Structure formats: C-alpha cells, structure tokens
C-alpha cells in the first residue's frame, strides 16, 4: 500500500507540475509580441494567388525579406522537404521558424488527404494554386477552398483534409511550435522510416532558430 501511495503521490505531483507548465506557456503565448501577423501573410499570399506557383513563391519570399530583414532564410538554405503526417504526403519549404511562429510554403504534386492533426497552435493557409477540401469535426459536409482563399485551423481543432494534385499554399503558424513536431514527424518515424527526411526537418528548423538568435543578438549589438 505504501508503494502504491508513493506512486500515486508522484503521479499527482507530476500532473500538478505539468498543469503549472502548461498555464505558464499559455500566459506567455497570450502576452508576448509576435513578429508576423496572420492577416498580413494571408493578404500577401492572396496578391499572388492564381499565378504560376513558383513565380508566386519567389515574389512572396522577396516581399517577406523586405518587410522582415534577418528573419527569412537565405536562398542557399531553402529546401523542399517531404512531409508525411496523418496519412497524407506533401512537401514544405520552411522560410521562418522560432519557438512561437513559422512561415512555410506547402503543397503537393499529387492528390493526397488524411487527418489534419490537433495542434497547440493556430495555423492559416492561403491557396495559391489548386484546391483544398476540408471536412470539420462534428459536421457532415466538406468545404472546398480555391486560389486566394484562406483556411484558418484554430488550436485544438481537428479536420479531414484533402489537396488536389498541383495545390500550393502559403502557411503561417502561431503557438508553441515544438508541440506540432510530434504529429508532423510521427509517420516519418514509425511508418515511412525516412530518416533522411527526419534529419532534413530538424536541420532546417535548427537553421531557422540559429538565424533568429543571430538577428536578435545583432539587434542588441552583440554580434
């Protein structure tokens, strides 16, 4: 009985600590200032919707670098990386990432679909080309989005998602970004076992964090 009581106390203490950590994170996320704005990213992407996606992406990258110097990866670090998650497969090109925000280009050359995942982050996508279909939890009908449309996936929400081949979009996420990695990498680790992609993903995220650190220190006059 003493052993069981000790285990129960440790479990209760662990849950209490976890609850405190979660509350501290929630407070931090709601009170901190952010570099990017969801509406601004969506508006920038919408201006280039319907264009050839490669041309559109190039123009969007140029505009982001003008508005946010030191926060967008240089061309030599940009890389298209496969993403397997929730049963679907796509490709992403990460432009910016920190602990609380990211911007990436995303799309697929083939029809694909599956589960959206449930995140501790708000995520928005603006369609450049193709079509995106979303079926929200608790509903019986899906909705189709076209070039220029923006889809907002709020924290805690789960949906069924489907991209037609040739769909490309600009994505912005805000929240505790490391919490999204579990879903984003689970299929890669336990299903495809594509450890090259796993390495590429961690490497590009690390490069983004290093860029943010360097820019922060430069602004303080320490680098």
From Swiss-Prot:
Q: Which GO terms describe its biological process?
A: lipid transport
Q: What else is known?
A: Sigma receptors are classified into two subtypes (Sigma-1 and Sigma-2) based on their different pharmacological profile.
Q: One GO CC term of this entry? A: cytoplasmic vesicle
Give the record's membrane topology.
Single-pass membrane protein
Task: Name the chain's protein.
Answer: Sigma non-opioid intracellular receptor 1
The protein's superkingdom reads Eukaryota
In this chain, the site described as Important for ligand binding is at 125, 171
* Pfam families attached to this UniProt entry: ERG2_Sigma1R (PF04622)
Q: How does it associate, per the subunit comment?
A: Homotrimer.
Origin organism of this chain?
Taricha granulosa (Roughskin newt)
C-terminal hydrophobic region, as annotated region: 176-223
Q: What is the lineage of its organism?
A: Eukaryota, Metazoa, Chordata, Craniata, Vertebrata
Q: Which residues lie on this side of the membrane: Lumenal?
A: 1-7
Q: What does this protein do?
A: May function in lipid transport from the endoplasmic reticulum and be involved in a wide array of cellular functions probably through regulation of the biogenesis of lipid microdomains at the plasma membrane. May regulate calcium efflux at the endoplasmic reticulum.
């Amino acid at each position: 009985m003493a052993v069981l009581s000790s285990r129960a106390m440790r479990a209760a203490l662990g849950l209490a600590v976890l609850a405190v950590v979660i509350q501290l994170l929630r407070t931090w996320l709601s009170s901190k200032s952010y570099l990017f704005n969801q509406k601004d990213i969506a508006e920038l992407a919408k201006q280039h919707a319907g264009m050839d996606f490669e041309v559109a992406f190039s123009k969007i990258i140029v505009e982001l670098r003008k508005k946010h110097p030191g926060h967008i990866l240089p061309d030599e670090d940009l890389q298209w990386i496969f993403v397997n998650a929730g049963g679907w497969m796509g490709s992403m090109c990460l432009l910016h990432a920190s602990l609380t925000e990211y911007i990436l280009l995303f799309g697929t050359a083939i029809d694909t679909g599956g589960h959206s995942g449930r995140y501790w982050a708000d995520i928005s996508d603006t369609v450049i080309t193709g079509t995106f279909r979303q079926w929200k939890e608790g509903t019986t009908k899906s909705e189709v989005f076209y070039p220029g449309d923006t889809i907002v996936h709020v924290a805690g929400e789960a949906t069924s998602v489907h991209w037609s081949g040739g769909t490309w979009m600009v994505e912005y996420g805000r929240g505790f970004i490391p919490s999204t990695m579990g879903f984003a990498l689970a299929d890669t680790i336990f299903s495809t076992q594509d450890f090259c992609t796993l390495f590429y993903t961690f490497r590009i995220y690390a490069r983004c964090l290093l860029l943010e650190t360097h820019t922060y220190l430069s602004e303080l006059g320490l680098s």
